[in-house]
């Protein structure tokens, strides 16, 4: 049954839907799981992925469906809602369907954007658990990451306080001689805390640590989160963690978690994190939640492990990429699928009339502020101009060889004439297009959308990567900039050029993925520029090295690894009932 999403808040819909949500033992029977494959945690459960994959190794994979979007407004365009709506629509068509989504960060949940639990009748439940820590994965990652920082700062203190002979006699450790000006790692916390971007630590005496500048980043930007998204099993996870570069010594040599003898203990914190959590749509389709890296500063995907499990357990598996096709889909295409060896059947491009109007020259959209009337009343001229961004993204998807399906995530203020413009432009660009009212009506509102995806899945495709791994780093970046972003070329800073030359000449980085770091609010590096800008070049100021995740991250423009909390954050409206413990105000 569909709830009245125009009168009920998301948390209220979740509360009602949870009354009939399958419990772990019911999911076990429904999904055909063995008892030992389900690790119950209250009314949620984790799945022992290795046991499931081994048991179902000979079973053919289901259809692999990715969901992306056009360049969004700061409000987001409903990719999670669309992903869940598609699961519900396919379920309403009688299909065996499930999906995989990322775990939300506490930062955006308590800030402006909200939980990423979907919305209306296309919602992930139970919403409170999803929004407030779930089964502890992000907490495990914070503990593991910060243990690495504890190991490094303690080592620096002891090496300062003891000479070589004392260090060997008292601790059995060799001197690492870490350069305090070349520490790559910082501390992490799962909030948007701009006051922690630049800090000084170790104030006090010789037993109070090592005095130096330091920093905090948001937890989901941690390399450990990126590793969780791409790891294949616990052994792979442990190896990658040990390879993380935490700093450089005074001779310029990398210092890793293995050098600090802390990598194995960090992996121990994540022994259960490796298993995905099973949740439910509001219409009771299964959905795995696993990993939660940001897309503009990391890989922006749910885990490879979750996709491998889902493709074995159901016939249609839906997964979401962060932000727009230029960022999230590009990383799904050239990084996630390259690492996993999985080939998708369809990519869904989520579009809203609101975002298209913004790209057509509409007034500025500001999170937390009321929308201008241009976005809530018919304006065909803005839509007509704005569809160029959608057409560009369709072209990006088609370069991969995947069949694109445009989903018009329809709001109740959109008009038929506006939607007709979008459909005409999408079909002219070679994509199927369907409108969907899943927010309002759940699966019944997504039938046209589900049918388009089913049809697209039955067609063959010629999926291939944008570039071979043999291509040099700077050539890869140039290809991404020109063919995905629409740039005229790339301008490298002297520092970035020197680092790129070093990386290109060192064979150990030859198989590292290229992970672009760029704003999600524009095809360019400048978040102000909307639509499909022409006559611009992409500046690369630095290249970050994630030696554990095996990413090389060229940075376009300035991106902070620690977002800030805005002036009207969501936490002001979140409350808990002392009598029942029920949480209200989440969205």
From Swiss-Prot:
Pfam families named in the record: FTHFS
Chain positions recorded as ATP binding sites: 73-80
GO biological process, one term: tetrahydrofolate interconversion
Coiled-coil zones: none
Alphabetic keyword roster: ATP-binding, Ligase, Nucleotide-binding, One-carbon metabolism
Enzyme Commission number(s): 6.3.4.3
Catalytic activity field: (6S)-5,6,7,8-tetrahydrofolate + formate + ATP = (6R)-10-formyltetrahydrofolate + ADP + phosphate
InterPro entries registered for this protein in UniProt: Formate_THF_ligase (IPR000559), P-loop_NTPase (IPR027417)
Pathway assigned to this chain's UniProt record: One-carbon metabolism; tetrahydrofolate interconversion
Top-level taxonomic group: Bacteria
Keyword Zinc-finger applies: no
Family to which the UniProt record says this protein belongs: Belongs to the formate--tetrahydrofolate ligase family.
HAMAP family, alphabetized: FTHFS
Protein name as annotated: Formate--tetrahydrofolate ligase
Organism: Desulfosudis oleivorans (strain DSM 6200 / JCM 39069 / Hxd3)
